[in-house]
Amino acid sequence: MDQTPLSDAKSRLAAEVDGRADVLLDVSRRIHAQPELGYEEHFAHDLLTGVLKDAGLAVTRSARGVDTAFEARAGGIGPLVAVVCEYDALPGIGHACGHNVIAAAGLGAGLAAAALAEELGGQVLVVGTPAEEGGGGKVRLIDGGTFKGVDAALMVHPADADLTAMDVVALQQAHVTYTGEAAHAAAFPHRGRNALDAAVLGYLNVAALRQHIAAGERLHGIITDGGDRPNIVPAYARTEWIVRSPTVAGLEVLKTRFLACLEAGATAAGCEMDLEWIDPVYADMIDSQAIVERYRANAEALGRIVRVPSPQARVVGSTDMGNVSYVVPSIHPMIRVAPPGVPIHTPAFTGFAGGPEGDAAVLDGAKALAFTVADLWLDGGLVERAQGEWREAVAGRSGAVAGGA
């Protein structure tokens, strides 16, 4: 088959990734072996920025005032494509979300693209985004201006299957405290106001509400403080919650119903309640169909079979990449790291992320992303189609919250 400029570019990008395979796999394994929680990823930050700087990219460490974020840029003119890296881990189970794979695949794509950027007439920005697991690192970078002028943003995420997208829903966390009045639980129970009762009644109200919420909506919580001794009426109780809905607009409606459940519990127990909504809001994901179809073709050219997620087998999650998708056309495809049925956020997945399956995903992910960067650089109409599609999608989703406002 004759080589077109685009196919020739992809062949050369693949060679760039292969030539760096030892470095990329070493980075993935080292990050996997030294898991760091959100905003504490100093080892990963220094490792990734060191490799990027050694390769000649213009590196900004601690970008936008975020200590463990970074930006690395190459190229002069042409479409600016951001390749996103994540590298925070989970408490107790390490890289059970496979962020070591995300970091190394993004690194590989960025290095390969940077090597050809000047020649192919494009720009690449490798963005290191800390604290995806609840800390909203990307939101801080959005607010700081990282994605201004970016034409598209790309990343891959490990999973137990190759998929064009994950079902990303909007999310906000809440911390709730209840204040009552302590009393001896046997001698003077009538003098007490039981804060734990208020928390439990609120929890049960939310449990009843779950029967009557929309598909894709989720309410999950824990009681973090319910008193000190059973013979003392608890004067203080505390709960933590996560509220999810398919869109930011739907999230606001669900939050109102959720709040009513908790307030009713506090009223019934005669206690005071204070609810703190934790920023940032994680937005739902607007997947660029124009771009993800190119990613799919590129990944399948590497031998992977990439499916469109089935509505009957929804895997619901949340990510601050959703916020990025409200400010620039974005994709968040899933790349297989584990066998079917091994979910993320489990110890079993941690093992696969650091094993041969994770290594294969690093190299395939780097190539598929780099190929997609080339599509955006060399297909003159792709950026325009993606941006037109994106503007229409954003306009159709009212109540969007992209940054931290």
Language-model segments: residues:
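Metal-dependent amide/peptide-bond hydrolase catalytic core
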Residues: P5, L196, V200-A405
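Histidine-centered active-site/metal-ligand motif
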Residues: H32-Q34, D88, H95, H99, ...
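General small-molecule cofactor/ligand-binding pocket signal
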Residues: T60, V127, D274-E276
